């Protein structure tokens, strides 16, 4: 087994090394960089890239990467490490926080207020965010055979753990199935997003959405850990029996339910609930608590995203619903893989993607 070379550093088989992607100096002359941890196995195998924190306020993915590097005790090179480097086949490139400065500012975007996940593959001589995107794309994506991008819902929303992938790319769909969430949503991603540009360049990429921003939610974190390990087992990188959900629903479209009036919101549903078209999913009150409006589901399907903010204005997104008939929902409970046909999920002109 040969050593793995990353940014001029030689990494011997069976070792883990802390590295970085350099970004140039900050305002005070301080060096700026993206932290990277490379686990290089003792056996040959694929290179899997694991990326989190492209949006600085989305922290669940950061914790997923931490646990995969160091185990539950967060101490390197101990017996409880999640991944045994001596038994690892291939290489895992871990990037726990891409947008370091955004994280320190507790905001989604970079310090220049641009969304890094609309700027891939980036530009070496571009603005701050383009340079971050370029460093990640050239340093990690170009080295990876496969990629997993970890996200949470934006501020004041939450997402049921689910994977988004381009169903029209066979390897992406296979990775999504292997990850093992109950819901898999077809989405190639917006132009400039990491998963779209990486997949286009030949690195099959999937995205996990789990939980909300600004916190570590251990249920969401554990779903991410299990999913990454499932993918590694699928790729032959580790020996492990995959832990799959009781059902898996493959859906091609989703639709937002939006508030038609402002006020104080009371949700009547939670992520994972199956709702029927016309079902009451939330109500809006005036400042004294009197009901003024009811929000109904625009389609039949499963709630995968929900606002957490009780203060709403007309047009605000309330619930993201993946489109699925009641028959398909019942079928999914007894069949391992159920795919909702395209004809059940047409007419949605809105983008699913916050990531």
Regions found by a protein language model. Name each.
Residues 1-355:
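Structured catalytic-domain cores with a bias toward divalent-metal coordination
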């Amino acid at each position: 087994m040969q050593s793995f070379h990353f940014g001029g550093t030689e990494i011997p088989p069976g070792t883990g090394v802390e590295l970085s992607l350099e970004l140039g100096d900050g305002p005070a002359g301080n060096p700026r960089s993206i932290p990277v941890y490379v686990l290089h196995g003792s056996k040959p195998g694929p290179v899997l890239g694991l990326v989190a924190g492209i949006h600085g306020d989305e922290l669940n993915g950061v914790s997923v990467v931490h646990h995969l590097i160091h185990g539950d005790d967060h101490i390197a090179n101990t017996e409880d490490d999640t991944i045994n480097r001596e038994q690892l086949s291939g290489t895992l490139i871990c990037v726990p926080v891409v947008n370091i400065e955004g994280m320190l500012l507790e905001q989604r975007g970079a310090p220049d207020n641009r969304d890094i996940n609309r700027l891939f593959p980036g530009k070496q001589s571009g603005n701050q965010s383009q340079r971050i995107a370029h460093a990640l794309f050239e340093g990690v994506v170009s080295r990876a055979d496969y990629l997993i991008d970890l996200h949470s819902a934006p501020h004041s929303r939450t997402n049921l753990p689910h994977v988004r992938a381009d169903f029209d790319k066979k390897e992406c769909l296979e990775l999504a199935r292997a990850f093992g969430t109950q819901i898999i949503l077809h989405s190639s991603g917006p132009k400039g997003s990491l998963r779209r540009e990486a997949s286009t360049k030949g690195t099959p990429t999937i995205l996990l959405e789990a939980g909300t921003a600004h916190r570590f939610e251990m249920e969401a974190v554990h779903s991410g850990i299990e999913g990454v390990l499932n993918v590694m087992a699928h790729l032959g990188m580790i020996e492990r029996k995959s832990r799959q959900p009781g059902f898996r629903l493959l859906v091609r479209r989703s639709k937002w339910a939006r508030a038609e009036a402002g006020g104080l919101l009371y949700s009547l549903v939670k992520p994972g609930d199956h709702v029927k078209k016309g079902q009451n999913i939330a109500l809006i009150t005036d400042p004294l608590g009197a009901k003024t409006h009811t929000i109904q589901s625009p389609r039949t399907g499963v709630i995968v995203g929900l606002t957490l903010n009780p203060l709403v204005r007309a047009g605000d997104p309330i619930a993201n619903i993946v489109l699925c008939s009641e028959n398909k929902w019942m079928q999914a409970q007894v069949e391992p893989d159920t795919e909702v046909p395209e004809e059940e999920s047409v007419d949605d002109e809105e983008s699913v993607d916050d990531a």
